[in-house]
C-alpha cells in the first residue's frame, strides 16, 4: 500500500488574502444589427418601393387612359388610300376639304365599301391631328376633295387654329411620353 498508482485529487483553494472585486456591468454597444433584422428591413424597404412603383404606374395608367387611342398616320393612310387615292399625294395626305367626313360616309354607303363609320372617323382623326398635316396648314394652301380637285384655300384664321392645335398636340405627346416612360420602367 505504500505505492499509490492512482493520482490523488486535491482541491485547489484560493488564498484568503485575495477577495473578489465586483465590477460594474459592462455595457456593450452593438454597432451592427443582427442579420435577421437587416434582412427584415431590406424586405420592408423593397416592399415599400414596389408599392410606391405600383401606385405610380396605376396613376400613370389612369392619366394615359384619357387620351384617345388613334391609329398611326400610316395605318390611317392605308385604310383610306385604296378607295380615295385623290386624298393623298403619294403616301402623304393632302389637306382635306371641310365636311369631307359626310361626303366619305355617303360614298361608303353608295359604293358598299367595307369600312365602318368608326374606322373611317378614327382614320380621319389620325390624319387631321397629325403633326405633318397641321404643319402643312399654311395660309393660301389648297384643300382637296375626294377626287383630288382643289375646293378652297386655307385662311389666316385656320392657320392660327392649326398652330394652336399643333402646340397642344406636341404638349400632349410630351406628357404621354413621360407617362409611358413611367409605365415602362421596372
From Swiss-Prot:
Record flagged with keyword tRNA processing: no
Keywords (A to Z) from UniProt: Conjugation, Plasmid, Repressor, RNA-binding, Transcription, Transcription regulation
Protein name (database record): Fertility inhibition protein
CDD domains (alphabetical): FinO_conjug_rep
Keyword Glycosyltransferase: no
Assigned protein family: Belongs to the FinO family.
Disordered, as annotated region: 1-20
Amino acid at each position: 500500500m505504500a505505492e499509490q498508482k492512482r493520482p490523488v485529487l486535491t482541491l485547489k483553494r484560493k488564498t484568503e488574502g485575495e477577495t473578489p472585486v465586483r465590477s460594474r456591468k459592462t455595457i456593450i454597444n452593438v454597432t451592427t444589427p443582427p442579420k435577421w433584422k437587416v434582412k427584415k428591413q431590406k424586405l420592408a424597404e423593397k416592399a415599400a418601393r414596389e408599392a410606391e412603383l405600383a401606385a405610380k404606374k396605376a396613376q400613370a395608367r389612369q392619366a394615359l387612359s384619357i387620351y384617345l387611342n388613334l391609329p398611326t398616320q400610316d395605318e390611317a393612310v392605308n385604310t383610306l388610300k385604296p378607295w380615295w387615292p385623290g386624298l393623298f399625294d403619294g403616301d402623304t395626305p393632302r389637306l382635306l376639304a371641310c365636311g369631307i367626313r359626310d361626303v366619305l360616309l355617303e360614298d361608303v354607303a353608295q359604293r358598299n365599301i367595307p369600312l365602318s363609320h368608326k374606322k373611317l372617323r378614327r382614320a380621319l382623326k389620325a390624319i387631321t391631328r397629325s403633326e405633318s398635316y397641321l404643319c402643312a396648314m399654311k395660309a393660301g394652301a389648297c384643300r382637296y376633295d375626294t377626287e383630288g380637285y382643289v375646293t378652297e384655300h386655307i385662311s389666316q384664321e385656320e392657320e392660327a387654329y392649326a398652330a394652336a392645335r399643333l402646340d397642344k398636340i406636341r404638349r400632349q405627346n410630351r406628357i404621354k411620353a413621360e407617362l409611358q416612360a413611367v409605365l415602362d420602367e421596372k
